[in-house]
Amino acid sequence: NVKKQIRNLGVCCESFTGDISNYNTAMEMFDEVHRHFGNVDILVNNAGISIIGLFQDMTRDEWDRIMNVNVGSVYNCCHFAIPDMINAKSGRIINISSVWGNAGASCEAAYSATKGAVNSLTKALAKELAPSGICVNAIACGAIDTDMNSFLSDEDKLSLFEEIPAGRMGRPDEAGKLAVMLADAPSYLTGQIITLDGAWI
């Protein structure tokens, strides 16, 4: 459905379904990207899951799963995209992170840890890749109205709105617009964790 909507806008679009935390699946996806579009110019790492609950109640399998999806997928995609960017001496990597990557969240310890890792990787890669003309930045999202937050009741949302100075949750299109801005930002803007949270944290 999304692919159809994009194509209706006159934009060339392909879709790929798979577990991006799996290295071989990621390799297959980038093979498809190269076949349809050629080299990778812009990479947005947006795969992510969350597990809500006490740290002591989390199983090792749950810990490994969230680490593989939230951090492993970033490794996989960067690993396959960066060679194209180095060859072109240009490129943009945009990692979708969270305010919890800096602040940490009770009952979301693993999620917070993964986003902290993404933030550190963003800064490290920015330094490593800047000589090759590649910019690496992250968007630290606050409460965004997506399926990940669909578990919140109406009462929970009202309480949350009271905490956020903007008085609402962010919209997915606002995160998307910021990603588009970063994709075309000045090349001197790199290594930054840009917060999108309505002045919440």
Segments and roles (model prediction):
Residues C78, T114, T122:
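Active-site helix of classical SDR
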Residues L54-F55, E62-D64, L160:
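Substrate-binding pocket helix/loop in short-chain dehydrogenase/reductase
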Residues S98:
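Residue(s) in the substrate-gating loop at a strand-loop-helix junction
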Residues A138, E162-L189, L196-G198:
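C-terminal helical subdomain
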Residues A130, C135, L189-G191:
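Short, small/polar-rich loop/turn modules that mediate ligand/substrate recognition or access, typified
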Residues P83, K127-P131:
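Alpha-helical segment proximal to the catalytic Tyr-Lys
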Residues F55-Q56, A103-A109, P131-S132, G167:
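Active-site loop immediately N-terminal to the catalytic Tyr-X3-Lys motif
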